[in-house]
């Protein structure tokens, strides 16, 4: 009996960790809501025409400043107060495949699609979370689907934000500014994007733990019963020894 209680168990460890989280199900739902909210902030800032669209990256040299957004790229000369913005519909095929033009075109194709997919997955996670309460008979199916969609949203959004970092080199090469240009990541986009991705990851981890506990509930009950049985046996033994000593 004593040997059984000392055996390490993952489900027991997970259950002990979750004892320190107040209302883990409600807590995880709040995290999902915050992740979705920051994603909406990111989308709204990207769709704002005047900012073209939430700067993700700024490449700058002595003569030119290039702002890179999710849906567009803007060029501005140092001595100019206006900037020229390039969007997908302004793609010029006569450029001969220059690195700058090619990377700009690829950027404008990849990022709107990725962002749309992330929004779809995150919205599905919200819907599936609601369905868990409306149709609890299928809670296992809802939980697995919600875990999958939130994890996919986290990974895709992290991929999208990482591409913004990597694109600094391609834009510098395309502008023939290697070694002379400086690249800075947009603070607002970084905050919205990385916080949203991080919260989706946190929700997925908490949700995975809850699903693991639910799936191994019977095993957890057996371990708990075993532990209490061991404690009860010890108490009875101490009580018996006490009365024996008292009789003497």
From Swiss-Prot:
The keyword Transmembrane applies. Induction: Expressed during meiosis and in response to nitrogen deprivation. The chain crosses the membrane at residues 26-46, 110-130, 144-164, 186-206. It is found in: Membrane. Coiled coil: none annotated. It comes from the Eukaryota. This is Delayed minus-nitrogen induction protein 2. The lineage of its organism: Eukaryota, Fungi, Dikarya, Ascomycota, Taphrinomycotina.
């Amino acid at each position: 009996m004593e040997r059984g209680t000392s055996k390490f168990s993952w489900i027991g460890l997970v259950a002990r960790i979750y004892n320190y989280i107040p209302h883990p199900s409600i807590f995880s739902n709040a995290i999902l809501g915050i992740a979705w909210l920051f994603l909406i902030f990111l989308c709204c800032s990207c769709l704002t025409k005047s900012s073209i669209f939430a700067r993700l990256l700024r490449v700058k040299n002595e003569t030119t400043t290039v702002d890179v957004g999710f849906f567009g790229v803007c060029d501005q000369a140092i001595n100019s107060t206006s900037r020229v913005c390039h969007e997908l519909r302004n793609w010029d095929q006569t450029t001969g495949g220059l690195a700058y033009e090619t990377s700009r075109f690829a950027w404008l194709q990849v990022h709107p699609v990725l962002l749309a997919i992330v929004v779809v997955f995150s919205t599905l996670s919200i819907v599936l979370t609601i369905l868990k309460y409306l149709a609890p008979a299928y809670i296992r199916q809802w939980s697995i689907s919600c875990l999958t969609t939130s994890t996919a949203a986290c990974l895709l959004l992290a991929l999208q934000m990482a591409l913004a970092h990597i694109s600094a080199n391609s834009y510098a090469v395309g502008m023939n500014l290697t070694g002379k240009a400086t690249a800075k990541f947009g603070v607002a986009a970084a905050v919205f994007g990385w916080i949203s991705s991080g919260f989706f990851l946190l929700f997925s981890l908490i949700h995975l733990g809850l699903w693991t506990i639910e799936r191994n509930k019977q095993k957890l009950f057996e371990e708990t019963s075993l532990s209490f049985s061991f404690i009860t046996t010890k108490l009875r033994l101490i009580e018996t020894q006490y009365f024996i000593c008292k009789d003497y």
